[in-house]
């Protein structure tokens, strides 16, 4: 039996607290499995990248955003729509250079660290939320935008805010991706 054509797809929501606690358990297990913080950071980024490449389809289907014409429009959509949709927060945006390809997302509140007081002992270079960087990078790559995404500041490391830096490297050649006429 097939679904009626007019029926909207159902989206399953997971409890935010369950997700945050599960993520914390994942990071704790990775810290046990890997001795070096760099390996944990790389694994979290890789996981996030995989999530981002799939999440972008859901985002585009649910948000109905149009085509963006500048990097600043893209960053505003990420901050005001994507973060709000998936994490329930709206980070502030700053542009970091005159060529307008470097931006920062400043999170006053980071839901992923809601139940975390500090980084584990001896893990000072751990980027606990590196999953977010991978998600953003993966999603941008799926819409043909190469970007470098890193944490610039982290509350878990004593900074006053959490800041994610996004640098657009270059716009990919769109002619390659357009159908031939």
Swiss-Prot record:
Give a yes or no for keyword ATP-binding in this entry.
Answer: no
The major lineage groups are:
Eukaryota, Metazoa, Chordata, Craniata, Vertebrata
Gene name as annotated: TRAPPC3L
Q: What does this protein do?
A: May play a role in vesicular transport from endoplasmic reticulum to Golgi.
Where in or outside the cell? Golgi apparatus, cis-Golgi network; Endoplasmic reticulum
Please report the name of this protein according to its UniProt entry: Trafficking protein particle complex subunit 3-like protein
**SUBUNIT field:** Homodimer. Component of the multisubunit TRAPP (transport protein particle) complex, which includes at least TRAPPC2, TRAPPC2L, TRAPPC3, TRAPPC3L, TRAPPC4, TRAPPC5, TRAPPC8, TRAPPC9, TRAPPC10, TRAPPC11 and TRAPPC12.
| Entry coiled-coil feature ranges | none
Is Lipoprotein a UniProt keyword of this protein? yes
Pfam families given in the database record: TRAPP (PF04051)
